[in-house]
């Protein structure tokens, strides 16, 4: 069934678009049926770390207070169940180590968890930039729990290079708002991969920006024309990355929690 009458009035975000790319049926459950999602370990953990970093950058917590806050609030903030004990222990330890080693920012902070709204074509968008800062130009930073890797610069892009390019689309979309507010595009797009204490710094590229704009609008057009809403079933991803899995009949038929 086609739901263009609902979709055409939507306010878009990077996550809404990528939800459709990951699984059209999940998009249907979340944004057409508007089902409420359930807690998941990876998303809970990421949100918790984002909150702590935000509190530090805004001065609500001092550097010395971060580990204590983390330990005191981890269990009540990270509710979802990890796939196994080893993953839980690694994530817990790496988050604590990052907060113990965190360094004061050297650049001028212009915004933290900055809410943005803008238009792309005729489509309304919203988003949140984890950090907007200025050094020799404007930089935008996304805090990531994923252990992404810096670009290899090989002639033939590796799997991790291609994955990085996909993640960069979020920051390229946010760059529209930066241009609208500051009159210039970001100089750098940065991922703060806090679990591995790795900073990935990519220069803004106008061609990649234009390609991202086209990708976003083309995907929205596909969503507007969608009629089948097919599921994309892969057990681990469905179980631990989809907050609608308990309400998805396809996942239950596939085996569910068995």
Feature map (PLM): residue ranges:
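RecB-family 4Fe-4S metal-dependent nuclease core
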Residues: 1-258
């Amino acid at each position: 069934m086609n739901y263009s009458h609902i979709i055409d009035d939507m306010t878009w975000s990077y996550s809404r678009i990528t939800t459709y790319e990951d699984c059209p049926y999940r998009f249907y459950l979340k944004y057409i049926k508007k089902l409420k999602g359930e807690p998941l370990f990876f998303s809970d953990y990421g949100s918790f770390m984002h909150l702590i970093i935000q509190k530090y950058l805004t001065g609500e917590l001092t550097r010395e207070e971060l580990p204590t806050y983390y330990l005191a609030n981890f269990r009540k903030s990270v509710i979802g169940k990890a796939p196994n004990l080893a993953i839980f222990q690694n994530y817990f330890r790496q988050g604590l180590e990052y907060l113990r080693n965190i360094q004061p920012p050297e650049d001028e902070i212009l915004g933290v968890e900055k809410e943005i709204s803008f238009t792309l074509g005729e489509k309304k968008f919203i988003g949140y930039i984890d950090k907007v800062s200025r050094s020799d130009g404007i930089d935008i930073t996304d805090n990531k729990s994923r252990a992404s890797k810096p670009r290899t610069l090989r002639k033939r892009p590796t799997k991790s290079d291609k994955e990085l390019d996909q993640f960069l689309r979020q920051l390229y979309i946010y760059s529209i708002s930066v241009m609208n507010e500051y009159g210039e595009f970001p100089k750098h797009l940065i991922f703060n991969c806090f679990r591995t204490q790795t900073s990935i710094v990519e220069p803004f590229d106008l061609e990649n920006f234009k390609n991202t704009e086209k990708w976003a609008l083309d995907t929205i057009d596909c969503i507007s024309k969608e009629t089948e809403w097919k599921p994309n079933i892969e057990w681990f991803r469905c179980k631990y990355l989809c907050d609608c899995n308990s309400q998805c009949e396809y996942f239950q038929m596939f085996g569910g929690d068995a």
